[in-house]
């Protein structure tokens, strides 16, 4: 089987996507994937995405209404990643999971914590940027330096670290 393109959506009320028309970005990105690739697209809704007043619900009807031909996943993430060629998302942390599984990513935003390991343009979907283990380790190490416990915050350690 040819490998799949996995598109992972975010909940439309996520604060990370309030600076753009996420529905428009989602639709145009899915159409752009089809423009540059013949791969089957698997659409993965955020696991917490449920119908909510004032927000679009990303279901089969939503995709069909917008002329998007993608299969909606009902699998867990680990299963979705098994036959994956790449993962596309705006700035979801699922992109970190993908990198950890050795799967290339395309991030739609430079606000993604893993953007430095991302192919930047959908038009490059069939020519993805591949990173060395050393490059991946460096970025993941930088991310880990930004993780702090409540106790460390109480002691002011993050502030000492960043503002020394």
Label every model-predicted segment.
Residues 4, 40, 85-86:
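Structural motif
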Residues 10-14, 47-50, 93-95, 111-114:
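Short, solvent-exposed loop/turn segments at secondary-structure junctions
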Residues 30-73:
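Catalytic donor nucleotide-activated moiety binding site of glycosyltransferases and closely related
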């Amino acid at each position: 089987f040819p490998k799949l393109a996995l598109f992972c959506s975010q909940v439309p009320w996520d604060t990370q996507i309030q600076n753009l028309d996420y529905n428009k970005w989602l639709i145009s990105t899915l159409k752009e994937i089809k423009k540059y690739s013949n791969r089957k697209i698997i659409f993965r809704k955020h696991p917490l995405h449920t119908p909510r007043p004032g927000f679009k619900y990303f279901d089969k009807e939503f995709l069909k209404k917008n002329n998007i031909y993608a299969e909606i996943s009902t699998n867990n993430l680990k299963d979705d990643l098994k036959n994956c060629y790449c993962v596309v998302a705006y700035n979801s942390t699922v992109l970190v999971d993908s990198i950890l599984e050795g799967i290339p990513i395309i991030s739609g935003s430079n606000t993604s914590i893993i953007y430095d390991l991302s192919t930047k343009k959908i038009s490059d979907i069939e020519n993805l940027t591949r990173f060395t283990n050393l490059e991946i380790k460096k970025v993941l190490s930088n991310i880990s330096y930004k993780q702090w416990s409540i106790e460390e915050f109480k002691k002011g350690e993050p502030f000492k670290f960043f503002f020394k």
